[in-house]
Amino acid sequence: MTRRRSTSGTSSRSSTDSGLSVDTAYLEDNKHNNFANGTSGLTDETKYRDVEDAEADVDEPFLPTSSKKLGSGSRTRQIFWALVILCLGGWVLALVLFLTHGRASSQTASETLQQQESDSGSTSAGRPVTLQQVLTGSWNPRAHAISWIAGPDGEDGLLVQRAEVDKEGYMRVDDIRSQEGDDVDSQSGRILIDKAAVRVNGETLMPTFTWPSPDLNKVLLMSNHEKNWRYSFTGRYWIFDVATQTAQPLDPSVPDGRVQLALWSPSSDAVVFVRDNNMYLRKLSSESVVSITKDGGEDLFYGIPDWVYEEEVITDKSVTWWSNDGKYVAFLRTNESAVPEFPVQYFVSRPSGKRPPPGLENYPEVRQIKYPKAGSPNPVVNLLFYDVEKDEVFPVDVPDDFPDDDRIIIEVLWASEGKVIVRATNRESDRVKVFLIDTKSRTGKLVRFEDIANLDGGWVEPSHYTKFIPADPSNGRPDDGYIDTVIHDGYDHLAYFTPLDNPDPIMLTTGEWEVVEAPSAVDLRRGIVYFVATKESPTQRHVYRVHLDGSNLQALTDTSKPGFYDVSFSDGAGYALLSYNGPSVPWQAIINTGGDEITFEKTIEKNPRLASMVETYALPTEIYQNVTIDGFTLQLVERRPPHFNPAKKYPVVFQLYNGPTSQRVDRKFTIDFQSYIASNLGYIVVTLDARGTGYSGRKVRCAVRGNLGHYEAHDQITTAKMWAKKPYVDETRMAIWGWSYGGFMTLKVLEQDAGETFQYGMAVAPVTDWRFYDSVYTERYMHTPEHNPSGYENSTITNVSALSKATRFLLIHGASDDNVHIQNTLTFVDKLDLLNVQNYDMHFYPDSDHNIYFHNAHFMIYERLSNWLINAFNGEWHQIANPVPEDSIWDSVKRSVPAFAH
């Protein structure tokens, strides 16, 4: 599932959803900009719809227009009655303000609602946030990524940089210690590539990606990049020699071949690569290439994942792993011959880049994707090994393995002396087996088994953060081991398993909080484990360290105030790039973690431009709260417009995603579409992380298993009813919207609510029947359709009669969505047609995938969402027969009496 974004910030902010090769340099911009450049109909000069008490209510954009036609009498009579109504309205308004103000003052908090904190420092003065700013990334923090690299002689703190203006050489390796303080030695680094343009056999190459060899004597270059799926791509690969500054094709016999993956050996003497779904080995001592496999093809993949493994299991382009000593290569063999195909049509573009045969120019291009839907055959995946010295491929049979049709391999980790740790789950992801394989003896055994279905009824998410801990008797580690994330008392925590076959770990962390993508790094010399966790709050992230025996847990970041941190460590964990991502304006710094005290060595980003914008724009105020529903404590943020007046009535928009393990309520700094709605349109925006979401423990997370949509919708509706009772909320103007899983949830809420609480909804790229979505994701949370037929039926959007009771809803889908297929929306619309349900609008974007970008679509869709929402809260959708908004009385008066226009 996509659109895994988060939402939060300080008083003025909310928030926006990598493995890094050395193509990204230290101090290189890494803006994570999800928006394409372009233009929008809104500008910074767009009139701000303020909500100050001194302004006339009729100027507010969300007030409904009249739904009755004005009489056809004389203009004078019209003006007279308009003035009478205005005077009467003013008297009534004064009375209402008095009563509501008193009510607001005397209101007591609901026992089910517990406010954590109110960020009250939002900027109320200044211009509103514009949609164009949001879509073009004007509010995105400037961020940098460091490509840490291990030194060939064990040096720590080395990093790769590209194209620094104050340093010579296109690509270089620097020691972070040479940059401490203000006196940076610009000549201290080692140049790997002198010039960006590389000449090879008379051809000029502009590398897209670069990967230095571990000994830093060679660089793997990639040019002619072509995107495949979310993480995968192809290109032409070259081996660049640092000493001579010359390059040659990775495979001299096929210089124009498109390579899908290439990886250096740890000993820097060979490259394993995949081309046309087969694996090859190029030893640098020879220009010839060795074929590791020969039968790869359309349905058989070696070393790279198919679509569903790339999307839902590995979240990477590689399923190939070198052993630490470079003697073996482990890789997956993926057979998807039994997986059914789904056709994705392109009506405008031709992504293949191929000209159609004569006579077929007017037919759409069709891409057939092997896409296993829930209940259909999965790809069969097996782990194979290649002995480099013997030039031999072999499997290792292990006892108690899952059957071929019930196996998902989620992680492969090399240990020492040819040993491998393999984690696998069953098809429904609720039984985990950990195997220890010895490639020298070609034997294996089961060393751990976790029956999660019986433990808490939940599931396990694929993760790839397990760390190998080599033996070091002189440092108190007599045996090899590894650190893994396990379930402990209902929360995700770090466990240290040693020796490798020991199923009983040393718990490094415990408590009612969770580690996140952990561990981040391990300092083997000092025996310290670094990790990020939610120890202070589910909405926060702080960096911690703990010793390998589980003692002396310490925070590296300031936990006395809300914070959302991320961190990347040098190879030896002696240095780190610390990124503060909110709630205030983000910053980044290099820190030294090698001593007992953490010291700041160099601040590399303060985002001064963003800090200036925060001071000059009218930003929403964010109120973070807890909501308790049916005994579950859930996280919520309410975004209030600038100049919020509790005596007024505001429309409310609920924005949600709510996919299993996801999070939208966090303390990141983000100015996004929700911020625009609150700042510019003057609406309140509420986001609730309902049951099923992540980082609040497994009780909250696993409650939705087998029945997606039911409890999440109940939580959203229950919370909306709480808000509808608030004195500052207009209960007649409440909407909900979401994208992807959020689109599914929007329809599920409208179905369950049946017009009682929400009048409007906007669903983008929604799943409408989980039998249409991919098997790996769906069955993890729903079991198979065979095992849970009633759950699938309950989760399907079927009660269209209930949706007809909403005032109106909007459906949007990309016509070439390869993730959530347009089949979902079309079959749902057929149900609407059968019962003559007409209270909806629909829009398709040609050739757009799940992100909806093709041909200006990304700007179009957000403008459409914004305008549709304005029309909804202005009452236009009440006029089903005539959806063109009529003039309000005030507009008629302004045209009749010029003085009123000013």
Curated annotation (Swiss-Prot):
The keyword Transmembrane helix applies. It is a single-pass type II membrane protein. Its EC number is 3.4.14.5. Residues 7-21 have a biased composition (Low complexity). One of its GO terms (molecular function) is serine-type peptidase activity. Residues 1-23, 53-72 are annotated as: Disordered. Gene3D superfamilies: alpha/beta hydrolase (3.40.50.1820), Dipeptidylpeptidase IV, N-terminal domain (2.140.10.30). Residues 100-902 are vacuolar. Keywords: Aminopeptidase, Glycoprotein, Hydrolase, Membrane, Protease, Serine protease, Signal-anchor, Transmembrane, Transmembrane helix, Vacuole. This is Probable dipeptidyl-aminopeptidase B. It comes from Aspergillus oryzae (strain ATCC 42149 / RIB 40) (Yellow koji mold). The lineage of its organism: Eukaryota, Fungi, Dikarya, Ascomycota, Pezizomycotina.
